[in-house]
Amino acid sequence: PGATWTSGSTCEIIGYTCRYDKPDGKKDVLPFTWCKNIETGAEQFRWKGFAMPRPLYGLETINNRPAHPILIVEGEKTADAARKIFPNFNVVTWSGGAQASGKHDWSPVHGRSSTIWPDGDEPGINAAHEIYQALKNHCENIRLVPPPFMDGWDLADVTPDFDPKAYAKKSALPAAEYFAPAHTVIEHTEP
């Protein structure tokens, strides 16, 4: 694989996410998880998805640094990049792409100050909304950083001419405000 990420707690590895870059520029991201055969009892790693609810990638940082706020991004590659940019945050993500955010156990984030920084595309915004819905009754403070660019951009794409810390400081807003329904204009007609 071109990259591999480990999932589990600090003392128990439950699987890996493996990224294979294809010649056409696309990618395959495959889970390699610890499995138990219910018929034989045999245990081994297999090319199989994580059991649901799936664990978050970066979970160990939440447990090791309980006073640090949470930053939620999309994808392991982006999470690793975000950790370098925002070292005072516990950075977490989910596996399986934007459509899989609802298949994960978000309870480790409950009660924590959290910021969601979605990918700059429609699936990324939709995933951020789904995560916000999962957390809004469990976290006092949930903020969202609107994507600075809407072409699939994420924090792994930062270039020297863009300062993500300054942008986040200037642009972060309460997630409830970002996801509030647009104001509806009701036209009154004369009888």
Spell out what each predicted region is.
Residues 1-7:
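Short acidic, Pro/Gly- and aromatic-enriched capping/linker segments at domain boundaries
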Residues 7-78, 177-191:
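Intein modules and their embedded homing endonuclease domains
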Residues 23-28, 44, 61-70, 76-182:
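TOPRIM fold recognition
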